[in-house]
């Protein structure tokens, strides 16, 4: 387990004194105190960031203000969220929040719902429309042009996702007209980061939120959101490919660089604003290939 806290100078000093007998040397110049307590390491950085890593990370971190997350025990009466497109240069960013009740369990089992990464695109395109029809959800689709505008306004790759997850949950709660027992987000950042960014947002859900790694493997609501988001992303990529006249690949690899370079040569650099996430490194690589 890996837990990150931001502590004051006094708290860092107290921690260092408490675990001084466990202190070891660190080669990292930015670590001012390093200790190994059993199978758990404690790294205190000059910035005040403290990283607890190992089997007792949660226990030790709780001594300095960390509050352990309560993992929901039920699959139902729960909202789950997931996003797709954040790792792809071409195409937009899709975030979906879905609500699963007891009445949906049989249907979801029949559909063979699982994390979208474990399903073929063909399978996703088969079952996603049925999920969209049956499962209460809110899907937010941010086209590349809007994405670039939001990033230019001061958001970053993490804060834009926080804003979208937060808004999708808020809108779904309003749609349901009642609070779910739990909300689970497939973790894409630390809890501290999420809280920092979400505090700047206007609307906030009423139910407590839990961020979990690989939540799509644990909760059907997250898996449903994963599938719907992937479907929306594939549809968006298909639409943009048709509009541009180029087959736009998913992902952010060499093929994306080459296709982007072809678009630049054919339509000019400005054409990418409608098709791709410009802050990705692919933009500079494509410009180099296109010899701009």
Curated annotation (Swiss-Prot):
MF-aspect GO terms: magnesium ion binding; RNA binding; RNA-DNA hybrid ribonuclease activity
Localisation per UniProt entry: Cytoplasm
Q: Where is the RNase H type-2 domain positioned along the sequence?
A: 76-292
Print the keywords alphabetically. Cytoplasm, Endonuclease, Hydrolase, Magnesium, Metal-binding, Nuclease
Q: What does this protein do?
A: Endonuclease that specifically degrades the RNA of RNA-DNA hybrids.
Q: Which family does this protein fall into?
A: Belongs to the RNase HII family. RnhC subfamily.
> What name appears for this protein in its UniProt entry?
Ribonuclease HIII
Species of the source: Lactococcus lactis subsp. cremoris (strain MG1363)
């Amino acid at each position: 387990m890996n837990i990150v806290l931001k502590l004051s100078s006094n708290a860092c000093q107290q921690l260092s004194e408490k675990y001084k007998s466990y202190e070891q040397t660190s080669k990292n110049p930015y670590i001012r105190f390093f200790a190994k307590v059993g199978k758990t390491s404690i790294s205190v950085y000059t910035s005040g960031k403290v990283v607890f890593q190992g089997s007792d990370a949660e226990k030790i971190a709780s001594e300095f203000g960390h509050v352990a997350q309560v993992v929901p025990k039920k699959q139902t009466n729960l909202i789950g969220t997931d996003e797709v497109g954040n790792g792809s240069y071409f195409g937009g960013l899709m975030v979906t929040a879905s609500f699963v009740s007891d009445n949906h369990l049989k249907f979801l089992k029949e559909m063979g719902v699982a994390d979208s990464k474990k399903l073929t695109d063909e399978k996703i395109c088969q079952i996603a429309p049925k999920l969209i029809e049956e499962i209460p959800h809110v899907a937010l689709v941010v086209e590349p042009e809007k994405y670039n505008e939001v990033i230019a306004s001061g958001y970053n790759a993490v804060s834009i996702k926080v804003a979208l997850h937060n808004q999708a949950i808020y809108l779904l709660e309003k749609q349901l007209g009642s609070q779910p027992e739990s909300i689970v987000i497939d973790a894409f950042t630390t809890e501290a980061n999420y809280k920092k960014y979400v505090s700047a947002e206007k609307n906030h859900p009423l139910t407590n939120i839990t961020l979990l790694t690989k939540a799509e493997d644990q909760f059907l609501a997250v898996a449903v959101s994963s599938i719907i988001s992937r479907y929306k992303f594939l549809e968006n990529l298909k639409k943009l490919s048709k509009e541009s006249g180029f087959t736009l690949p998913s992902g952010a690899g060499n093929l994306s660089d080459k296709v982007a370079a072809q678009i630049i040569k054919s339509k000019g650099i400005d054409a990418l604003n409608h098709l791709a996430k410009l802050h990705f490194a692919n933009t500079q690589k494509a410009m180099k290939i296109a010899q701009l």
